[in-house]
């Protein structure tokens, strides 16, 4: 083991200042040590702020977007209420044709006497306490299920894996990547054609659908299906299909701070975090006119790109 010999140590020359100067030197070193310690604390705080700032800024941009503060309103836009009327008419047509089922909990949200009310069947309920923020005059509040033709998942029996050349792609929440895309190729699962046919009757993803994670650590992630591709997602996710609404707007809305907070409060706390389908369908959506939805998404993506944020 390496060591310094006694003879070497005893022969060292040591500069020796007067006693009073020794005291002044020690006091100075103690003061510098204190300053270094204070600097270290300040540095750690700065590092914490720097690491938290990008996420906080991203949330702030999203919140501005869904509150109607990201782009100016255009008086020539068709009001959101007119869009809702067209959505209701389209849903009735699809119900008549047997393509979708009638909503069990269809509701209409409206304003009266400076308050917000929700009409559920013949019952009217004041929902002022549920409204999280003010929105522009030509926007409206609506439940997510009332602007979608599908919010659903597959049966909860997990199908067995098969070789890729024998099956159909079967994704899960882990395939909703942090860069805002969906993983279709790396370490993915495949299921038999028979299982696919059986499970796809409830929720078969299509282009412009949104895959929304509702179970586990990835809870609250929303990803847009940007291509026509045959695949299923496990019950860890649900398929959200907007109707006559700009899908990217709903995708970003589902990742807004307001929805994230709601999902955290609403999830089941026993075992693995699990957000029930009923809670997702009841999400309150601040709905802008269709053209403004497009402008919001365009500006949102410009800002996120400038800040080098991936969603």
Predicted regions and their residues:
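Specificity-determining recognition surfaces
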Residues: 1-12, 256-285
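A short beta-sheet element
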Residues: 1-9, 172-173, 189-255, 276
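Non-catalytic DNA-recognition/assembly elements of restriction-modification systems
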Residues: 11, 19, 23, 42-45, ...
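Hydrophobic alpha-helical bundles that form the membrane domains of multi-pass transporters
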Residues: 18-19, 29-33
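Feature representing long, continuous alpha-helical segments
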Residues: 23, 27, 142, 206, ...
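Extended, domain-scale alpha-helical bundle/helix-rich regions
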Residues: 45, 50-51, 55-128
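Low-complexity, Lys/Gly-biased intrinsically disordered segments
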Residues: 95-104, 127-129, 140-182, 196-200, ...
């Amino acid at each position: 083991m390496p060591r310094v010999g006694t003879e070497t140590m005893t022969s060292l020359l040591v500069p020796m200042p007067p006693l009073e100067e020794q005291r002044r030197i020690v006091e100075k070193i103690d003061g510098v040590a204190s300053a270094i310690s204070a600097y270290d604390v300040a540095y750690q705080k700065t590092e914490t702020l720097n690491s938290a700032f990008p996420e906080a800024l991203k949330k702030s941009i999203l919140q501005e977007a869904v509150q109607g503060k990201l782009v100016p309103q255009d008086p020539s836009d068709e009001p959101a209420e007119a869009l809702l009327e067209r959505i209701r008419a389209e849903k009735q047509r699809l119900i008549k044709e047997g393509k979708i089922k009638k909503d069990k909990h269809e509701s209409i949200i409206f304003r009266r006497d400076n308050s917000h009310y929700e009409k559920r069947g013949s019952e009217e309920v004041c929902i002022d306490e549920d409204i999280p923020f003010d929105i522009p005059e030509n926007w409206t509040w609506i439940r997510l299920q009332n602007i979608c033709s599908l919010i659903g998942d597959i049966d909860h029996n997990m199908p067995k894996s098969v070789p890729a050349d024998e099956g159909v792609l079967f994704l899960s929440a882990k395939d909703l990547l942090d860069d805002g895309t969906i993983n279709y190729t790396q370490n993915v699962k495949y299921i038999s054609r028979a299982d696919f046919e059986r499970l796809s009757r409830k929720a078969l993803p299509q282009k412009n659908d949104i895959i929304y994670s509702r179970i586990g650590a990835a809870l609250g992630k929303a990803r847009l299906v940007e291509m026509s591709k045959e695949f299923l997602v496990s019950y860890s996710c649900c398929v959200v299909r907007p109707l006559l609404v700009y899908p990217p707007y709903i995708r970003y809305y589902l990742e807004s701070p307001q929805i994230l907070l709601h999902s955290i409060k609403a999830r089941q706390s026993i075992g693995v975090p699990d957000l029930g389908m009923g809670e997702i369908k009841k999400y309150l959506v601040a709905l802008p006119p269709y053209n403004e939805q497009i402008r919001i998404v365009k500006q949102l993506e410009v800002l996120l790109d400038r800040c080098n944020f991936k969603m």
